[in-house]
C-alpha cells in the first residue's frame, strides 16, 4: 500500500509534468513562424518586415512595417488580435491559423526586429 507521502510525491510529479507539457505545447517557434510568414505575410510586410513599398502604395497603407519600434512595443495580445482579426486592409487570419501558428508567426515577426 502507498503511504500519504508517496501519494503526494506522485501527485506533485504528475502536476509538474502536466505544466511542463503545457508550456512546451504553447512555446512559440520562430522557425515554424517563418514558414507561415513567408506564405501569408511577406507580400505586404516584406521579407525583412520593413514593408513592401509597392504594396503599401497600392493599398494606401503606411502600417506595413512590422519591425517599427511602435509595432514592436505592442504587447503580444495586441499583435495577436491584429493577426487573428485583421486591421485596416489586412485580412483576418484567425480562421486559417491555429493558435500555435499565430504565436509562431508573432515570434518570427519579433525576431525580425533583433
Where are these regions (language model features)?
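Absolute protein N-terminus
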Residues: 1, 25-29, 114
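Bacterial N-terminal signal peptides that target proteins for export
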Residues: 2-12
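Electrostatic cytochrome c docking/interface patches
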Residues: 18-36, 74
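Axial heme c-ligation environment in periplasmic c-type cytochrome domains
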Residues: 57-65, 69, 78, 82-113
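Short hydrophobic/aromatic-rich motifs at helix boundaries and adjacent loops
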Residues: 12, 50-52, 77-78
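Periplasmic/extracellular electron-transfer cofactor-ligation site
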Residues: 30, 34-61, 87-91, 111-114
